[in-house]
């Protein structure tokens, strides 16, 4: 239950599989490059490209977290996030969502088995809502709101 106490500020457009980080030779630092920017001390990163929405998520050891998404027309969504991860279910190798909301509780790691995804423009950004069911058939809702940033 430790993971449920972790706080997430925002939600992601879809549940994502965490990608492996590349390790630098002779150093303990993990690095990952997103849109030409290299991040060091990376704890976890995500790369997803479903439903025409590309999303990349990077968490660094100092707690700085950057998420960016690319819509098909070349407009980027970018937001700095606060991040928590479900450590009680296999840690960084698991599927995860940001801020999955159940009617009666919050849980931070779930792989949707079914559901619908709606993406719409909203106040200079995009709003993404996923209604779905988790592995146990329990309903959940996931939300992402992000501003538009030119690449």
Where are these regions (language model features)?
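Sec-dependent bacterial lipoprotein signal peptides
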Residues: 1-19
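N-terminal cationic leader/targeting segments used for protein routing and processing
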Residues: 3, 30-31, 121-122
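Bacterial Sec-dependent N-terminal signal peptides
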Residues: 15-41
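Short, hydrophobic/aromatic-rich segments at coil-to-beta transitions
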Residues: 27-29, 52-54, 123-129
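Short acidic/polar mixed-charge low-complexity motifs
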Residues: 37, 63-65, 136-140
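Surface-exposed helix/loop patches within compact recognition domains
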Residues: 43-122
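C-terminal or internal capping secondary-structure element at the end of a domain, subdomain, or sheet
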Residues: 119-151
């Amino acid at each position: 239950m430790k993971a449920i106490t972790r706080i997430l500020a925002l939600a992601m457009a879809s549940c994502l599989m965490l990608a492996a980080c590349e390790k630098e030779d002779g150093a303990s630092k993990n690095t990952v490059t997103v849109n030409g920017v290299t991040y060091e001390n990376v704890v976890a990163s995500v790369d997803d490209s479903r439903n025409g929405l590309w999303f990349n998520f990077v968490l660094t050891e100092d707690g700085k977290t950057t998420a960016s998404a690319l819509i098909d027309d070349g407009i980027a969504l970018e937001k700095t996030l606060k991040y928590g991860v479900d450590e009680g279910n296999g840690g960084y190798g698991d599927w995860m969502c940001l801020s999955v909301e159940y009617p009666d509780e919050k849980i931070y790691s779930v792989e949707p088995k079914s559901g619908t995804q709606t993406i719409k423009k909203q106040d200079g950004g995009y709003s993404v809502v996923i209604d779905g069911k988790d592995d146990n058939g329990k309903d959940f809702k996931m939300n992402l709101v992000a501003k538009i940033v030119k690449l």
